[in-house]
Amino acid sequence: MNILIPMAGEGSRFKVCGYEHPKPLIEIDGKPMIQLAVETLGLEGKYIFVIREYDNKELTSRLENLLKSIKKDCIIVKTSTLTKGSTATCLLAKKYFNDNEKLIITNCDQLMHWDSKRFQNFIDDNSDLDGIAITYDSLNEKNSFVKLDNNGYASLFKEKERISDKALIGLHYWKQGKDFVSSAERMINQNNLSQNEYYIAPTYNYLIN
């Protein structure tokens, strides 16, 4: 299974709050945020990180060394420019997951309090599902949302638009990585932006349709 973590954004919300270091390196309880994100995710696989190549080369080197210490066999893809959103960032590494292998894309700034083995078992027991998104109940417009059909399957995904009370936590799964790539490329080719960015969740709509 490939596990992709994009982290090439500006981290503008953290900058506004006064943080000077790049978001992945901000410490929480003595550990960098990205280290806690990986540790609490608790899933085994081939880790792929897409990172920003900072003007400060020392920070870039520090982040690379940290990622290799967390997952020694990880793949690191660097970009010197800001992309048009997380989907565009993910596609910078597509040659590493544009295949039939399972793919998970998750955030670099979330700490998971969950049973990762239960999730892995759910994937294994439901191999007929092309994609899985984990939700929680929320009405906050800052989230991604999914609408369910009468059978409990996803029928529509929207970014920053509350179409239900089912918000996504920011962990996305595809049975085949190539399905994400084809959906993402279609979304970008159609210039289907959400809030002027290409987000991950709306790519699922291309599997539904």
Stretch-by-stretch model annotation:
Residues H113-N191:
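Conserved core of the sugar-phosphate nucleotidyltransferase
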Residues T60-L63, C90, A154, G177-F180, ...:
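A general structural signal for well-ordered alpha-helical segments in protein cores
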Residues L66-K71, K147-D149, Y206-N209:
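Short, conserved catalytic or adaptor-binding loops enriched in Gly and charged residues
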